[in-house]
Regions:
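Acidic, PIN/NYN-like endoribonuclease modules and their adjacent C-terminal/linker elements
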Residues: 80, 96, 106-133
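Short, well-structured N-terminal submotif of metal-dependent ribonuclease cores
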Residues: 1-35
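Short active-site oxyanion
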Residues: 30-33, 97-99, 117
């Protein structure tokens, strides 16, 4: 299964030990993770704004990046989401032929699917992994 994690899930996984970290860890072990430089930069910016990036966070971020397949998303033909940053998540998933987007963002979750790509919450995704794994 090919998966794109939205920045909010990755931020939660890096900033706090807990459920999102568990979801990301399981996905890394069982799935192909797709990421883009645009999403990586968004995450780095978010971490920098909210916290100082310490050495441990930097190492964790680079370790995650090393496990990902990077793609270069093309801009969508027309805007899909209210927040243009959410369209980058969709474009990354398209460029990477992802099966699933994992997000906590209601603006994305309300779509349920985008061009055949399922959009799931972290809990829904973990349940899916448990069923198929």
């Amino acid at each position: 299964m090919r998966v794109v994690f939205d920045t909010n899930v990755l931020y939660s996984a890096l900033a706090a030990k807990g459920f999102c970290e568990e979801v990301v860890d399981e996905a890394v072990a069982e799935c192909d993770i797709v990421w883009s430089n645009a999403l990586k930069q968004e995450l780095e910016s978010l971490i920098t704004r909210r916290h100082k990036i310490g050495p441990a966070t930097r190492v964790a971020l680079e370790a995650y990046a090393d496990l990902c397949e990077f793609v270069e998303p093309e801009p969508l033909d027309k805007r899909v989401c209210r927040d243009k940053d959410d369209d980058v998540v969709l474009a990354t998933a398209l460029a990477g032929n992802a099966d699933v987007i994992v997000t906590g963002d209601e603006d994305l979750l309300v779509l349920k699917k985008f061009r055949g790509i399922e959009i799931l919450s972290p809990r829904q995704f973990l349940e899916r992994l448990d069923r198929t794994g």
